[in-house]
Curated annotation (Swiss-Prot):
Gene3D superfamilies: Gnk2 domain, C-X8-C-X2-C motif. This is Cysteine-rich repeat secretory protein 30. Disulfide bonds: none annotated. It holds the Pfam family Stress-antifung. Residues 39-141, 151-264 form the Gnk2-homologous domain. The lineage of its organism: Eukaryota, Viridiplantae, Streptophyta, Embryophyta, Tracheophyta. It is found in: Secreted. It comes from Arabidopsis thaliana (Mouse-ear cress). Its main location: secreted.
């Protein structure tokens, strides 16, 4: 079960005994024992208002949705933005680095369906799943700022169960792993489809157990320098988000991280380093 200040999410977790060790191992592929595409959270951007049935906004929105759905989802991220208010439309999605291609397509479809159900006729909304997030907004192409990190929509989730043993050491070791992955994600040698991957995953042995983790930035909008800044910022929130928790994550639209005490990434289509 995940929980936050205002949200409880049902997920299956494995018990963990936290022990201190120093061995750090980065892996290219992590097998998955608990592979899901669970709904995690959504946010209706009510300040953007609603659109009317049959309106020009609805026509543009549906046209963009179909256009993105016809793509190959090979890069794992995409955005489209066009027009001026009141009919400006922007759609973007980002899939997890291990869920590109067909898995990304399926998650995008789930995101669009979920937004229509949870934020009916809202001009703006964001929805997160295990494998992706999808955002729709009425921000115009002129106002859509791709050079600014968005922290407003960050949302923490964590396992309510705490690790046993030395909590301080567990926190320090897990944060060290996340920081190392942030550096890997921004390494110029970490390329994918001709662009910096801005994604990394790895595992860290702690006694007889392992902590598995990943970090990622929105590839289609976030520049490498911004990615580093974004990841550093949310990792600093670890003590408030995930202090001594058996698992946790911070969702966002510019960057995110996740750690668990079990493998949670796919072996195929993996972008791990």
């Amino acid at each position: 079960m995940y929980s936050s200040c205002s949200l409880l999410q049902r997920l299956v977790w494995f018990p963990f005994l936290a022990l201190v060790a120093t061995q750090l191992l980065f892996i290219r592929n992590v097998s998955s024992l608990n592979l899901t595409n669970e709904y995690l959270h959504h946010k209706c951007l009510v300040s953007e208002g609603k659109y009317k049935p049959g309106s020009k906004y609805e026509y543009i929105l549906n046209d963009y949705i179909r256009f993105l759905a016809a793509g190959n989802f090979r890069s794992g991220s995409m955005h489209m933005t066009s027009g001026l208010k009141p009919n400006a439309v922007t759609i973007l999605y980002q899939c997890s680095g291990d869920s590109y291609n067909s898995k990304c397509r399926s998650c995008y479809a789930a995101g669009i369906s979920g937004l229509r159900r949870r934020c009916p006729r809202n001009k703006g909304g964001i929805i997160w799943f295990d494998q992706c997030f999808v955002e729709i907004t009425s921000i115009s192409v002129i106002d859509f700022n791709i050079s600014k990190i968005n922290y407003e929509n960050n949302f923490p989730l964590h396992n309510p169960n705490r690790v046993s043993g030395n909590i301080k050491s567990f926190n320090n070791e897990t944060m060290a792993l996340l920081k190392e992955l942030a550096l890997k994600a921004n390494n110029k040698d970490n390329m994918d489809n001709g662009k910096m991957a801005l994604y990394a995953s790895g595992e860290k042995r702690v006694g007889t157990k392992k902590v598995y983790a990943m970090v990622q930035c929105m590839r289609d909008l976030v520049k490498p320098k911004m990615c580093k800044e974004c990841l550093e910022s949310i990792i600093k929130e670890f003590p408030e988000c995930c202090d001594g928790k058996q698992g946790g994550r911070i969702l966002g639209t510019s960057c995110d991280f996740r750690y668990e005490l079990y493998p949670f990434l796919r072996t195929s289509d993996s972008k791990t380093v």
